[in-house]
Amino acid sequence: MLHKIGIMGALILGLAMPAAAECLIEKDSIAGIKLGQNLKQVKQKFPKAKMERESDPEGVAYVAITLSKDVMVITHQDGDDDPDAPIKLHKKIDSLETYSPACHTASGVHPGMKIKDAEAKLGKVKKIIMSEIEAREYAIFTRHPKHFEFRMEMGAGIYSGKGGVPNQTRRYRKGGSILEISVSKYGGFDN
């Protein structure tokens, strides 16, 4: 009898404890951080989050928010272009991105996933576009979800070399994978 009470107590306690936070990538949020929120609201929702001012190799400013050892979300704020400026807690977030493999879309697509595996969930690659300035590669799938961008690892696309800029292709390297997934108030590659 005591054995059954112990098991029942453990089950009840388990249900009362909060589940581990899931890092879901949706059209307007990543890991519960929403487009349009400001960083003060994010800090209130995630008091243990670590926020750091960073910049990419091109000098674009962003704030990296570390939610756990497995989850980091990069936020861009409208008009926040100075990587040396202090973090602006009241500016709204207009773009979110993550490189964290623990984060995934509702269909299970995540950073680090092979392009071939993503095709099983999003349809065949319709095209891969290489951006003109940074030479970043983005895949567009036949069932591409609106507002999402899927950035490929560098060198994933196989280009003919004859096209104009930006280069476009449907071919990719066998081991090519998704580097990052982002959502933005400006939308993504919806075509």
Predicted regions, residues:
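Short helix/turn-capping signatures at newly exposed starts of structured segments
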Residues: A19-A135, F141-H144, Y159-N191
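Sec-dependent N-terminal signal peptides
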Residues: I5-L15
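Internal interaction segment
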Residues: H147-R151
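N-terminal secretory signal peptides that target proteins for export/translocation
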Residues: M1-L2
